[in-house]
Amino acid sequence: RPYQNPAVMATRNKTSKYSLRDNPTGIYAKADETLAVFVGDIYEGGKVSMLIQDLNGGYNNSKTYELSEGYNEITVEVGGLIYILNHVNDDIPLRLEDADNDQKRNIEAKTVKVHFANGKVNGYFDIQKNKESDWAQIRDNAKYQEIDVLGEYSHLTWRISDFKKYNTEITKTIENLDRL
């Protein structure tokens, strides 16, 4: 689905923009791997891209690839977690339930379907879809070193080994982060 570009609110609030990684896929790739990515209809004027983030080299160690409708074959230069970027300058709230009918129609019109024919499944936790009882299975099945955890307002990417070591209560953790 589309998300409002963080630069819009950053300009309005006179702050810096933060993460553009609003659409985690739960997929990861290794460097030099070739991915087959199918993309549905892209709305007029839309730009959809795939970002691969390797936190081993720091937050700025990422590579973005523009996607086009149909079949995309991409040999990735950087391995890591994969995100789909679909940013708009429209007035779209972060939470779908906060959208009015016009905003919901706009979100629906600018949602682009993306399918990975290959790639490795890592999974992610989304507090709006998952429960605490799902967490152990999601965490234990993750194959990459980090995993994405989505709250209602927050997005955390952290090392799986730390979540396991400290037996993290994930819903409590992300709810606390949402309240910040």
Task: Locate predicted features.
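Beta-strand-enriched, solvent-exposed domains that form extended recognition/catalytic surfaces
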Residues: 1-123
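Catalytic cores of extracellular degradative/oxidative enzymes
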Residues: 135-180
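Compositionally biased low-complexity segments at domain edges in trafficked proteins
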Residues: 104-106, 115-154
